[in-house]
């Protein structure tokens, strides 16, 4: 956490660590067990084994936040409402600072989704799983390129919570033709947002994205999940 170790670094031997910290082998191994459970290290067994440093994983934070939300009775609608607060603000910020590379990456994501929609309309056998991943990636790009790390981390935690909660509901209830049409509308909305960003129209981009999020909320929480349902990570 102090930045003294990098991802992939190998920790010293057990003997060296015991001497360095003045602890017993059982205490050290218990510390290893806890850090491994928190995805802070990975342990390889054998002659060439040892403990390797892992980068902090957002999914670990999301798991604990999700549990806290569930225990406090937070609804999935409340989680989505928080995204509605964060994303338009991020879009406004992005419009004032966007670079050409940001526009290129957003356009590439939209184009990939457009091609998937066209292919899915022509071939009912094509899976739409990639569509959901691309949609999340577009939102993720907006947050990442807005340039506020605190906002990006908070959004990432909320995304992981929503993905976990909605995964089974979406797979059960989504009608394919409705899903294809929803992705088609997303392509149109995403393209419009990119145009606002290209023009550096921060107010227009923010208004458009808030409307997009409101419409998406009615679709997502109206057909695929109960907005009043408490966050559930164990379905």
Language model features by range: what are they?
Residues 156-235:
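C-terminal all-alpha effector/ligand-binding and dimerization domain
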Residues 40-51, 120-128, 165, 169-183:
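Short, charged helix-to-loop "capping" segments that act as catalytic/coupling loops
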Residues 58-147, 178-199, 203-204:
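All-alpha effector-binding/dimerization core of bacterial HTH-type transcriptional repressors
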């Amino acid at each position: 956490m102090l930045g003294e170790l990098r991802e992939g670094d190998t920790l010293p031997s057990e003997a060296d660590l015991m001497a360095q910290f003045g602890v017993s082998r059982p205490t050290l191994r218990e510390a290893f067990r806890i850090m491994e459970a928190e995805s802070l290290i990975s342990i390889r067994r054998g002659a060439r084994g040892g403990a390797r440093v892992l980068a902090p994983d957002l999914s670990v934070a999301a798991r604990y936040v999700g549990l806290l939300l569930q225990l406090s009775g937070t609804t999935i609608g409340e989680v989505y409402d928080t995204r509605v607060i964060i994303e338009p603000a991020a879009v406004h910020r992005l419009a004032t600072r966007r670079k050409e590379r940001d526009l290129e990456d957003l356009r590439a994501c939209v184009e990939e989704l457009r091609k998937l929609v066209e292919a899915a309309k022509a071939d009912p056998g094509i899976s739409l799983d990639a569509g959901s991943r691309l949609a999340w990636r577009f939102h993720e790009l907006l947050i990442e390129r807005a340039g506020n790390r605190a906002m990006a981390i908070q959004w990432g935690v909320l995304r992981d919570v929503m993905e976990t909660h909605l995964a089974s509901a979406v797979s059960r209830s989504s009608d394919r033709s409705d899903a294809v049409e929803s992705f088609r509308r997303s392509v149109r909305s995403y393209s419009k947002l990119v145009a606002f960003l290209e023009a550096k129209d921060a107010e227009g981009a923010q208004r458009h994205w808030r409307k997009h999020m409101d419409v998406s909320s009615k679709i997502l929480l109206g057909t695929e999940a109960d907005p009043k349902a408490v966050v559930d990570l164990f379905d």
